[in-house]
């Protein structure tokens, strides 16, 4: 399959630079996987689409203020984007500079350059940085870091983004991008879903900056997926198996929840799914056999991205590309701060290719 098979025309005006004033008031395009039928509505329509006993699986990662600005002690300006926190003193990061720093380079970070750090090692495209500060890394990031808005949101981050670019149920710091399907859930909607009898479970996948990296090969089978840390604890496994046993659906909130659950299913030795704690490089594209997910809530993704490939593997290639064409025609808002989709599984998707 060619990367260009997953391309579509998107006017710049449809890229959302700010979220809706109310989280759950975004538009919702529903795609019936088996038939390809599309319906238009708002996000709160989920109350009618979900049944008592259905299981929603959320990603409870919390976005860290992962973008740092400063300079090398020798003078050159730098921008640091944290990929992951290694421990209380060290990070693994992307560094943008006129000349890549060498091991031993001292970095002065923050508006007042008061935070000192040292680049200690290089691992491919990533740099290991150690802070020379008594505070834990997370405290330093909270003090001087900027929210790492995606590159297609063409504006500086604002104070409001610290709340808006965060799910209301975020709990475990570590992501450098939000699991954006979850941004549409507010407390009243969550309460209404619970009252209806919808079950909820929480995985953790710390989204890395690699999620924004373009696919740089022509043939998608040649793409090497970036690695991200995921946790699928025993209580999530129990909730999934219980939902399946009673005939209810497992509904992933976002592609990161999909990748977490499917990673746990791939690693399982005996049951449908088993607990999973570790890095995953799972790459889902047409031809993949889904093992756990019955429905998916997700935002609209970039052309030629691994995420539109994941959706195509779930709903079917033709149904997915037709849904995106319709979304553009109907002026849905795209990407992280944009509108959402509710998609049910197409069992014929596994045999569909572009």
UniProtKB/Swiss-Prot annotation:
Q: Which UniProt keywords apply?
A: Cytoplasm, Queuosine biosynthesis, S-adenosyl-L-methionine, Transferase
Q: Where is the protein localized?
A: Cytoplasm
Top EC class for this record: transferase
Tell me the route in metabolism or biology where this protein functions: tRNA modification; tRNA-queuosine biosynthesis
Q: What is its EC number?
A: 2.4.99.17
Write down the SUPFAM superfamilies for this protein, in alphabetical order.
Answer: QueA-like
This protein's gene is called queA
Annotated family: Belongs to the QueA family.
What reaction is this protein's catalytic activity? 7-aminomethyl-7-carbaguanosine(34) in tRNA + S-adenosyl-L-methionine = epoxyqueuosine(34) in tRNA + adenine + L-methionine + 2 H(+)
State how it assembles.
Answer: Monomer.
A GO term for molecular function: S-adenosylmethionine:tRNA ribosyltransferase-isomerase activity
Q: What would be one Gene Ontology cellular-component term for the protein?
A: cytoplasm
**Which protein, by its recorded name, is this?**
S-adenosylmethionine:tRNA ribosyltransferase-isomerase
Q: Name one GO biological process term.
A: queuosine biosynthetic process
Domain of life per record: Bacteria
> What functional role does this protein have?
Transfers and isomerizes the ribose moiety from AdoMet to the 7-aminomethyl group of 7-deazaguanine (preQ1-tRNA) to give epoxyqueuosine (oQ-tRNA).
